[in-house]
Amino acid sequence: MMVESASETIRSAPSGQNGVGSLSAQADGGGGAGTAGTAPAAGRDASGREAASGGADSNGEMSPAELLHFQQQQALQVARQFLLQQASSLNSPGNNDSKQSASAVQVPVSVAMMSQQMLTPQQMQQILSPPQLQALLQQQQALMLQQLQEYYKKQQEQLHLQLLTQQQAGKQQPKEALGNKQLAFQQQLLQMQQLQQQHLLNLQRQGLVSLQPSQASGPLQALPQAVCPTDLPQLWKGEGAPGQPAEDSGRQEGLDLASTAVTATSFASPPKVSPPLSHHPLPNGQPTVLTSRRDSSSHEETPSSHPLYGHGECKWPGCETLCEDLGQFIKHLNTEHALDDRSTAQCRVQMQVVQQLEIQLAKESERLQAMMAHLHMRPSEPKPFSQPVTVSADPFPDGLVHPPTSAAAPVTPLRPPGLGSASLHSGGPARRRSNDKFCSPISSELAQNHEFYKNADVRPPFTYASLIRQAILETPDRQLTLNEIYNWFTRMFAYFRRNTATWKNAVRHNLSLHKCFVRVENVKGAVWTVDEREYQKRRPPKMTGSPTLVKNMISGLSYGALNASYQAALAESSFPLLSNPGMLNPGSASSLLPLSQEDLGVPGEPLPSNGSSSPPRLSPPQYSHQIQVKEEPAEAEEDRRPGPPLGAPNPSTVGPPEDRDLEEDLGGEDMPSQPCPLIPGWKPSLLHLSYCVKPKFTVSVGSKTPSSPLPPPPRVQGSYSLPPCSYLAYGDMRGQNPAPSPGLLSGVGGGLFRCLHRTKSPSLPGVWILAAELETMRFHRPPMGDPQPKTADWV
């Protein structure tokens, strides 16, 4: 039946010649036996088709080889007509409009190769075997590429010749007309190249050719590849008219040359290549023809690995749907995560995640730079948050302080030494618990970013105490059991839901630590409530609770410095090592800690010492010199808080330990260093300059007798950054007889110091200035209730 339909299709061609030719004669000569030599080309073609039809009628069937040869002859004739029409239209560019209207058939070569009289693709698949179909496609592809290459070369030669002739004749023509013609020729050449590239990309999309990177912009040199029989309809439907409806192109089984509207000479706009029809049915049941363009664009944008697909599951925030392959994931992405309100809200949440991670990245980078600068003894230069960095950081560590997104200055700026007290409290590091009071309340923060914290694996930037209080306050009766508090944490935050449940220990620790949480026994068992008074009491920053806060809050208060005579004594005993910048790093010379009224003592209060009394201090305005100490990064106060140096324990430092895993101390500020006075004549060895830990110790300077006419200098307490393993100690020598001699003495904190050099102050009678070297490295805070270290024991 298929052969009869093919014979009827071939017989429909016009016939006007006599004689019957054999199939072999038609294959060899391409014409009929009775064709006259003077007959036109159209007559020869018609007689050849009539001979083929007569042979088909006589024999009853057509072999695949004969059908293939017949198809090649038709394609060659149509291609020749197309090339002749293109050449004639380009020879007279001024008459392009009339030529276009008069031209009967002007289509791309790949479309012109298929005619009405060819068999349908389904008939070709039934007649020819798969190897024969592959051979047919390869031959057609090779022929088409050869035709395109020849046509491309001819067009280039003709355009160059026309440009040369126009340039020679341009001396007599107006320059504007010449420029317009040259521009038109260049546009034609460019559009021809674009047309060929689009056609090649269309073939590559269908899998017929493999385009190399070097062949993307040059002449067509691609080699055809073998295709399967299922791709044959896609090859024949490779190009269609841009204005042709998709339903008509999908309904047509063969392409009609007369119905195509694409012309190679109409260069007003380059023809668009229609994408191939997608064979993946959509879940919503829409026909694939209507959505082929959308499907093809989505498949082109989807590489082998998708950012939202990994390890066999969907990485859309909060989805985690298992997908076997990428195709199933694309189907899931188009159905479950379409453009709707939910997806838009999730996208906004992801934007907030990225913004907060960028802020955290800048903060961690600044912290890393400060650490490196401290280890290398170089002053750090923190960058503002607005500058991008390339250092990876874990998102949201415990106790993270969220800086504002519009901050243009770092959190710990360098403060000049002469900064007044007016601008002191406006900056500097602060603890998270005090920062919560001035920031937006936790309830409004959680209400605004509820979806964010519920789906994103990000630690909330609040203390455990604040979160526990919020959980209790959200309930109607303002009380929760421990298990209900756990459930609130896991329900509100994905961080606690997806990570190891070590945070439960912190919750229990906070419930028992803070006095604001009250345990009440009722019928259901033990429940927890919040005492708002106690909670508000712990909100303001404690001046004695954090060394960092103490240093920063008191550094700008009004206080006096050393007496003029005491300054002269220190100036006379300057150490040459620190005055030479080449011997030590810039960061090794220390500054001394500014003193507050608490350190200076209240007027009329004796200076605490080893059982002796001291005269009342003078008022602060009598001191004119400021001494500064380089502040070191604050440590956990419950582990490293030093005890009172001399005398009874200081009640201001005794208290419950802070929640160290919840609240985070920021590093201290780097201040300009000043040389620390040491003793002339003491030359440290290389052992003294080796790197080691610098402990915290106390320096006490006093007068020998209460009746001394000179006022005693203030007591200095703080951390010193001196030459490694070389420490300066001003000993309080009141009541010491005889004078101290070099040897071992015990320092505050349990360490031993070796006295290297001693000298009397030339201005202050009874005051000894000592230089001591660290003997042992055991420095720790004495346990509660233990006796404080004794004062200096001289050997």
Curated annotation (Swiss-Prot):
Pfam families: Forkhead (PF00250), FOXP-CC (PF16159)
Location of the region described as Leucine-zipper in the Swiss-Prot/TrEMBL record: 354-375
Superkingdom of source: Eukaryota
Composition bias type Basic and acidic residues, residue spans: 292-303, 628-642
Tissue: Expressed in the adult heart, brain, spleen lung, liver, kidney and testes.
Transmembrane portions of the chain: none
InterPro entries for this protein: FH_FOXP4, Fork_head_dom, FOXP, FOXP-CC, TF_fork_head_CS_2, WH-like_DNA-bd_sf, WH_DNA-bd_sf
Keywords assigned by UniProt, alphabetized: DNA-binding, Isopeptide bond, Metal-binding, Nucleus, Phosphoprotein, Repressor, Transcription, Transcription regulation, Ubl conjugation, Zinc, Zinc-finger
Residue stretches of biased makeup (Polar residues): 1-25, 609-627
Function: Transcriptional repressor that represses lung-specific expression.
CDD domains in alphabetical order: FH_FOXP4
Subcellular localization, as worded in the UniProt entry: Nucleus
Ranges of Low complexity composition bias in the record: 36-45
Gene Ontology CC entries for this record: nucleus
Description of its domains: The leucine-zipper is required for dimerization and transcriptional repression.
Location of Phosphoserine modifications: 58, 92, 546
GO molecular-function terms, A-Z: DNA binding; DNA-binding transcription repressor activity, RNA polymerase II-specific; identical protein binding; RNA polymerase II cis-regulatory region sequence-specific DNA binding; zinc ion binding
Biological processes per GO annotation: embryonic foregut morphogenesis; heart development; lung secretory cell differentiation; negative regulation of lung goblet cell differentiation; negative regulation of transcription by RNA polymerase II; regulation of lung goblet cell differentiation
Location of the region described as Disordered in the Swiss-Prot/TrEMBL record: 1-62, 233-252, 265-310, 379-437, 589-671
Subunit structure: Forms homodimers and heterodimers with FOXP1 and FOXP2. Dimerization is required for DNA-binding.
Ranges annotated as C2H2-type zinc finger: 312-337
Annotated gene: Foxp4
Location of cross-link Glycyl lysine isopeptide (Lys-Gly) (interchain with G-Cter in SUMO2): 181, 383
DNA-binding region ranges: 459-549
Protein's name according to its UniProt entry: Forkhead box protein P4
